[in-house]
Amino acid sequence: MNRSGFVALIGEPNAGKSTLLNKMVGAKISIVTHKVQTTRARIRGVSVEDQSQIIFVDTPGLFKPRRRLDRAMVAAAWSGAADSDITLLLVEAHRGLTEGVEKIISSISETGLNGKIALVINKIDKVDVNDLLSLSKEINESHPFTETFMISAEKGKGVDDLRRWLALNLPKGPWLYPDDQISDMPLRMIAAEITREKLTLRLHQELPYQLTVETEKWEEKPDKSVRIEQMIYLSKSGHKGIVLGKKGETIKAVSVASRVSIEEFLGVKVHLFLRIKVREKWMEETERYSEMGLDFRDGNA
């Protein structure tokens, strides 16, 4: 009997949601960096386990929103959880039951999420096993989780057990996607996210949060190669020189790194062209939110 359903990944920023999604899917479709709040949209990844099709929804990290974009991101996270059959709350083992996690658990109880809710303690390689057991007991006392898993998403520990449990607990029904599809994100959006990831890794402090990337042109050539033109939108003119770097070194490095990653994902030769444009109000433009897969109205205060 086939099964299929949606599994939402929620948690604080940097809890390892995107790393777990990429590990489950077997390909990199969600940004992974050391900086918080890099995932902006709800990203769906598809994994198959036996006769079950698991559709993972990687949501933006839950945090206290300050701007319209922040509010839209948090709204997308809770919406993703509300629409899912199973919700996984990821908690970092070495950080434990933080104030942020407590607020998420409180919100889970208040909103009355449908479906099963499992606790996933991630990054278990960073703490002692006795501390893990104590943390599991402490968190489970704050909410009646259906199941608890201890994993290292980065190293793959415990991930197979989690996948098997999910496969057995999804509702019975036909698969919702072709068996060879790993994401419902358009390729042009995945390519834009890859470039944004490379920018985030190269730039510092607040600058990565002040920019966005859009794929403006996607042309498949007769030789199977792809020409991709992308625009990097900045909110401040003073940031342009930083993104370009001395003699254009930064933007060149980003372009090379992004092109290599896009080629690995697509399996074809890629010709990538990046341009920069300053749009001080891009965070207030409806079109930018649509491109990121967010609802502009969710950003209303």
In which residue ranges do the predicted regions lie?
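Active-site glycine-centered loops adjacent to acidic/histidine catalytic or metal-binding residues
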Residues: 58, 122, 152
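Canonical P-loop GTPase G-domain recognition
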Residues: 115-116, 125-183
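Conserved C-terminal guanine-recognition region of P-loop GTPase G domains, centered on the G4
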Residues: 48, 53, 75-148, 219-222
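Conserved, well-folded catalytic cores of nucleic-acid-processing
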Residues: 23, 27, 46-50, 65, ...
